[in-house]
């Protein structure tokens, strides 16, 4: 009892099914989580590292990795900017551990965050106030 309408619907379904199959063949290009978040640091790698080191038996949320990558990227950019300024002040084109040391110790917040020793960084020049204007009594 299929009339004209039945054949038309069946034909429409088959053409729609064919176009759906073509759409399935055209896969979207994979987009990394770093590019989705607008970051340069690898979110997937940081997520894997967090899972391997977490005391929660590998249970780390997806946004935790994105947030951690954003923090690391921001801190790296901040340190590199300050170290680049230090190397530019010394008229050198290459950033050395000395420039990193000057940049970190020159910024109060970074100094409190990074309290460790930087290999090859040298020392920060400092003369105590009592030694600057020492007058001899004669």
Swiss-Prot record:
Intracellular or extracellular location(s): Nucleus; Chromosome
GO molecular function: DNA binding; protein heterodimerization activity; structural constituent of chromatin
Organism per entry: Oryza sativa subsp. japonica (Rice)
InterPro entries from the UniProt entry: Histone-fold, Histone_H2A, Histone_H2A/H2B/H3, Histone_H2A_C, Histone_H2A_CS
Stated family: Belongs to the histone H2A family.
Disulfide-bonded cysteines: none
CDD domains xrefs: HFD_H2A (cd00074)
PANTHER family, A to Z: HISTONE H2A (PTHR23430)
GO cellular component terms, A-Z: nucleosome; nucleus
Superkingdom of the organism of origin: Eukaryota
UniProt name for this protein: Probable histone H2A variant 1
Composition bias, Low complexity: 9-18
Subunit structure of this chain's protein: The nucleosome is a histone octamer containing two molecules each of H2A, H2B, H3 and H4 assembled in one H3-H4 heterotetramer and two H2A-H2B heterodimers. The octamer wraps approximately 147 bp of DNA.
Keywords: Chromosome, DNA-binding, Nucleosome core, Nucleus
Pfam family, one: Histone
Spans traversing the lipid bilayer: none
Region (Disordered): 1-42
């Amino acid at each position: 009892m299929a009339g004209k309408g039945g054949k038309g619907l069946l034909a429409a379904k088959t053409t729609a099914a064919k176009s759906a199959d073509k759409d399935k063949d055209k896969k979207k290009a994979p987009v990394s989580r770093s590019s989705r978040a607008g970051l340069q640091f690898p979110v997937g790698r940081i997520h894997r590292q967090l899972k391997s080191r977490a005391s929660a038996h590998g249970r780390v949320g997806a946004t935790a990795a994105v947030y951690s990558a954003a923090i690391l990227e921001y801190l790296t950019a901040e340190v590199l900017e300050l170290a680049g300024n230090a190397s530019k002040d010394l008229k050198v084109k290459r950033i050395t551990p000395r420039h990193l040391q000057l940049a970190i110790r020159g910024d109060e917040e970074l100094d409190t965050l990074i309290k460790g020793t930087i290999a090859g960084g040298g020392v920060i020049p400092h003369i105590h106030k009592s030694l600057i204007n020492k007058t001899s009594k004669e």
